[in-house]
Amino acid sequence: MKYGKLWPIGVSVLGVIALHVRVLSLEVENSSAVDTCSTHTILPGPKGDDGEAGDTGVLGKLGKDGPKGQKGNKGIIGDSGDLGLIGKIGPIGSKGDKGHKGLPGLPGGKGKSGSYCDCGRYRKVVGQLDVNVAHLKSSLKFVKNVIAGIRETDEKYYYIVREERNYRDALTQCRIRGGTLAMPKDQATNSLIADYISKMGLFRVFIGINDIEKEKQFVYADNSPLQTYSSWKAGEPNDGSGYEDCVEMLSTGHWNDVDCSLTIYFVCEFLKKTK
């Protein structure tokens, strides 16, 4: 009887416990994972495997230039360059020494016997005619050139001969024409000739001054010495090559000593005929 009364009570207690468990289970289902984790401690799991290597990244910006490095070793000598342009022609060299006499040549063959002819006098006449014709041609050429222009003072005419000659040939050519190389013995004459040279578009010409006979003792073409007047360029005469015994006039009017073998134009002077 005692156990029979207790059965209903036991059943009632079990029912209450089951109901309580049901309520707890519903609360757990309705609660979020965060709430669950916040009320429960989760232990860390084991270490995972290494992941695969990622792709190469994009090339970054260039950095600043580093400090200047040390000087490198001397390189190998390069190949020779191409031949350059030909330079300007240098000044005329000094006159060379006279060469040795050559060896005698072989004797010529025997000539044919000639016929008799009394041609000597005719040859002399023909030879003189050739000389006269040559002088006439030279004079004709001179007259044609003179028409192109001369300069004059009260007593003299001056004419630039546009033929390249050395000093001695220039003297001869002026004498053949009846004059001599120009001798500027005063400032007025010197200025007239200098202006003449410039107006003709020239740079220099021979004039009648030299020290051929005695070094540093310059004389005119008529052998009269230089006296009170001269117009030397600064530093002249200097006999630079050791053979500068003749004189040229520049378009500036200055004088310069040069080698007599130089071939340039020259200026002649002629006395005016008095009436």
UniProtKB/Swiss-Prot annotation:
**InterPro entries (alphabetical):** C-type_lectin-like, C-type_lectin-like/link_sf, C-type_lectin_CS, CLec_Tetranectin-domain, Collagen, Collectin_CTLD, CTDL_fold
Q: What is the top-level taxon of the source organism?
A: Eukaryota
Sorted keywords for this record are: Calcium, Collagen, Disulfide bond, Glycoprotein, Lectin, Mannose-binding, Secreted, Signal
Instruction: Cite the Pfam families for this sequence.
Output: Collagen, Lectin_C
**Family according to the record:** Belongs to the COLEC10/COLEC11 family.
Q: Give the Gene Ontology MF terms in alphabetical order.
A: D-mannose binding
State the name under which the record lists this protein. Answer: Collectin-10
Kindly list the cysteine pairs connected by disulfide bridges. 174-268, 246-260
* Limits of the C-type lectin domain: 153-269
Give the signal peptide, or none. Answer: 1-25
Q: What does this protein do?
A: Lectin that binds to various sugars: galactose > mannose = fucose > N-acetylglucosamine > N-acetylgalactosamine.
| Annotated compartments | Secreted
Q: What is its main location?
A: secreted
